Amino acid sequence: MSTDKKNRTVSHLMIWNELKWAPSEKQLAQFIHLQELLKEWNKKINLTRLVDGDDFWTAQVCDSLLPLYEELQHPEVSHKYIDIGSGCGFPGIAIAIAMPNSDITLLDSSSKKTTFLKEVSKEIGLDSRIKVVTERAEEAGRNPIFRSNFDYAIARAVASANVVAEYLVPFLNSTGQALIFKGSWSEAEQQILKKALAELNAEIQRTHEFILPNNRGIRNIIRISSINKCPHQYPRSIGKPKKQPLGY
């Protein structure tokens, strides 16, 4: 075995140990194919710089799946996920690979990115479980096809948590959870989020801090659940959640 391959194997083992989950041969092949396609498409459109080595495996794959460590212990369970601002496909495509019985909706406002997401989903054999939508979160959250229709609504690195909450909560069914992926997380941010969630008829279920392997830093996951049906006026019109954020 070459030194590079040995290093990759060690790196992968660290990640799988951290997740307490390991991919099947088919799933590993899908991740590798996804990495290859990202590199290829990056030459056409600017998707992400995190495509090589640990950049891909730790900062993309592990960072996408670690917040779902509980769900990964039962990957056979069927859930409906929506990934808001999916961009280059993380965390949505990673979740689709890891959770073979779940359906994933990838939402992004950029038609270039959704073209990529459609092509990649087809190339790695996931198009039967992945739906790609070109639309703003504020519009999709009012669409009866999507509103109140998901077990999990997820966003990674989109905006501040109180803004993201207004995007996510309208998508949740009565037992659904919104998951906000963050780097650092402060008590001040938590208080603002609590106030925002009160207006959305939702609450923080819990927060959890993770340390990514390979010295990739700290991540926080905020899990949110609905208390009651999200008021019909949310999400507000395009741009308003960012310009006039809830929680102040």
From Swiss-Prot:
It holds the Pfam family GidB. Belongs to the methyltransferase superfamily. RNA methyltransferase RsmG family. The keyword S-adenosyl-L-methionine applies. PANTHER family: S-ADENOSYL-L-METHIONINE-DEPENDENT METHYLTRANSFERASES SUPERFAMILY PROTEIN (PTHR31760:SF0). Its EC number is 2.1.1.-. Keywords: Cytoplasm, Methyltransferase, rRNA processing, S-adenosyl-L-methionine, Transferase. This is Ribosomal RNA small subunit methyltransferase G. It comes from Prochlorococcus marinus (strain NATL1A). One of its GO terms (molecular function) is rRNA (guanine-N7-)-methyltransferase activity.
